[in-house]
Amino acid sequence: VISRLDRGDFKIVGVAEKDDYLREHNGLRDKLDPNLFYADLGEMLDKTHPEAVIVYEPIYDHLRVVEACAPRGIHVMVEKPLAVNNEHATRMASLAREKNILLLTNYETTWYNTNHEAFRLIDSGAIGKIDRINVYDGHQGPFEINCGKEFTDWLTDPVLNGGGAVIDFGCYGANLATRLMKDEKPLSVYAVLRQNKPNLYPKVDDDATIIVEYPSATVQIMGSWCWPMGRKDMHIYGDKGYIYQDTPKEMRIYTNGKERQEIAPSLNAPYNDSFYFLKAAVRKEIDVPPTDLSSLENNLMVVRILDAAIQ
């Protein structure tokens, strides 16, 4: 948000932050009128009348924000995942549909050129019928990469975040798999949640392996705070070939007995950026189909998968 203000892509009309310290000490303070900061979300909404609200809060508080915004007809985009559990997600979806607001979920990987090129190739039949998807997401750990205390305090809390790595990084694979499997309902979800570093993360898992079974495919989601490096990549196997989504721009494709490396074509606005996408969706310049990575339908399934993994 801070980096985009100077570009004029959007106008911030208010910031609600219930934590007194964070409200007074954040990067937006140097960019915005102090009068735009509020301790109470409802007061901010009633005084500023925003078109949409972007939520950077503990996952547990996503429901609270939707409960405030939906009755006022204000669209919402939350950071991944949609909710801490299925109970919260169902309540949020009910409010959004009843009040006819958009409820979108943002993932970094939604804007990767390679993911969308993979979708296009698969939809064209390039690798045949999908039978296996392996998704790898994570990094060395929140403390290890020096995330701020204001973030790690809730990220490592089983109530506020809903879990550890299983939520933080398992959601990416569930989101992508749901899109690749065209919103098909899984047959089963099996998971192994580990604490490899209990001295650092005593309350939550730091490594999660989730196996999601579909009628014709197996998805293995590996979300971890124990990788030796940061990664967000995916391997998709079909009966005629495979696609390795290596980076946001680079991919390997195996068809007709040969592997080739490609740079995925750039995405066009507004499908290349969360803020452009939100603006276009709110102003009804684009539709958000149920199969979209940001859609409510996709992300309800994501929460169901994560809920099953934790249980």
Predicted feature descriptions by range:
Residues 1-32:
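N-terminal Rossmann-like dinucleotide-binding module
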Residues 9, 52-55, 277-311:
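C-terminal helix-rich "cap/oligomerization" subdomain common to oxidoreductases
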Residues 90-109, 129-133:
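Rossmann-fold dehydrogenase core element
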Residues 110-200:
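Predominantly a Rossmann-like dinucleotide-binding segment in NAD(P)-dependent oxidoreductases
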Residues 173-250, 276-288, 308-309:
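Contiguous beta-strand/loop segments that form the cofactor/metal-binding neighborhood of enzyme cores
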